[in-house]
Each structure stands twice: as C-alpha cells, then as structure tokens.
Amino acid sequence: MKTRLRVLRAEKEWSQAELAAHVGVARGTINAIETGKYDPSLPLAFKIARAFGKNVEEVFLYPEEQD
C-alpha cells in the first residue's frame, strides 16, 4: 500500500522515531510501512492519520483497480 507518510513527516519535520512515539509503535514499524513492507492494522492507520490531523484516505493510498 502506498502512503504519504514521508511527505507528511517532512511537513511536520518529524523523524520516523518521533512519529512512532506519537502513535505508540517502534520506529521500525514506521519504516516498514513507508517502504511498503508492512500494511498497518486499521487501528494503527487511524492513529497515524490522527497524528497528522488527516483522514485515513489522505495518508494511505489504495492501488488503482486493474481490469
């Protein structure tokens, strides 16, 4: 799943560790989400979106459906 985490973190000047602390996970979890190696649970996705003051859909981008 693609995300806007790097862009949003840059806007707030947050490191991965700072975002991780805000949402209660390890820095490695944020790294794995950003690199597409891990899809967050729904509760974690909401926590991350809330940390940025965004809706989940503004942070996590669903791949386009293919015919």
Residue spans for each PLM region:
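Short, basic-rich loop-to-helix N-cap that marks the start of a DNA-contacting helix
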Residues: 37-47, 65-66
